[in-house]
Amino acid sequence: MRYFMSYSAPNIGFVSLGCPKNLVDSERILTELRTDGYNIIPTYENADLVIVNTCGFIDSAVQESLEAIGEALEENGKVIVTGCLGAKENQIREVHPKVLEITGPHSYEAVMEHVHKYVPRPERNPYTSLVPAQGVKLTPKHYAYLKISEGCDHKCTFCIIPSLRGDLDSRPITQVLDEAKRLVDSGVKELLVVSQDTSAYALDQSKENQNKTVFWNGAPIKNNLITLCRQLGTLGAWIRLHYVYPYPHVDDLIPLMAEGKILPYLDIPLQHASPKVLKAMKRPGSVERVLERIQKWREICPELTLRSTFIVGFPGETEEDFQMLLDFLQEAQLDRVGCFKFSPVEGAVATDMADQVPEEVKEQRFQRFMELQQQISAQRLQQKIGKTLPVIIDDIDEDGIIGRSMADAPEIDGVVYVDNRSESAVKIGDIIQVAITNADEYDLWGTC
């Protein structure tokens, strides 16, 4: 007769807030938890401990994080806090003194030490063989975020990221490429390259290290962004770049896009167009030069999609400054644009600047900005009608098929609604050809 002993692994609840960079941190912590034998559950009720990975970028994010911590304490009582807001331990303790432990962002080892302290590591681990080679992922199986560096060396006056996440710290190129290959080998069709400042990759390293030859897959490579992108382009997946600061060497990425090595998509946070406002933000700013570069980029790669973000209502922004921004939008004809009303952030230099813009003026400028950009976006999407585009499928239900074109990043851009008239077998993650038949200011419609 055989006797089987039951095994119950400790349960860990997990709450992940914030941006894609924080999501990558959550994925790494979850991977280590599973590797150590813990069971991850989606509820507070049966959790032996709850981890809350917080965001602290703007005040509304801080409030959301504090509320999430409070909810976890109320529902469970045993809470460890990590993430960006964790860098402000006193602020958390003032509101939630019963939190067990607090760590800052990307403090993976410290988080695991705290978990082991309150919920000892299981002696027997039935999950080791179940942890996939690419680690635990919180995104759908067909796309994943690839974080290439941590921190930021810029001192933008509206931002506190350097104080939360530290100075720029680039990952070794072979480590990034190894992770990317594991992801693609696991079935990932699209890699979204993220960091606080993607175009600064490897600039924190000495010239000697940047020029040092290393080997990956038997090929000699250098440690820089262009080489990284060129090698990523050999993996057979869509490679999409986010958070690209407009350094001069970004120009060298455009030929790779024209050659089809990486997606013709550039996410560049320009923030404003008024030289005065840009100077106050401590952002680089020659509008004429930016426009010249955009024109050149489009000449080299006509299919290029440009996404950017802007801030309206920054302290000292006058109507003249705002009009410069509108004029820039009209001339630049950007494809995808996000706009934020300036929000004071504790610890940011701009929070204490003179000439704060009244909230009603911010709102009015936001509405005017969005109205103009919606017209521009609609006009640019109209130009896609009649074309046949590759579309990656994100969702299939009784209402139809939803995907994204090369011009659409998940969560932040538009989608493509697909009518499967051919009734061909289509699965989530497939990349199919779609004939575009209609468009509005955000989305496309088409048939396959």
Swiss-Prot record:
[4Fe-4S] cluster 2 binds at C152, C156, C159. Residues 382-448 form the TRAM domain. Keywords: 4Fe-4S, Cytoplasm, Iron, Iron-sulfur, Metal-binding, S-adenosyl-L-methionine, Transferase. Its cofactor is [4Fe-4S] cluster. It is found in: Cytoplasm. Coiled coil: none annotated. Its main location: cytoplasm. Catalyzes the methylthiolation of an aspartic acid residue of ribosomal protein uS12. This is Ribosomal protein uS12 methylthiotransferase RimO.
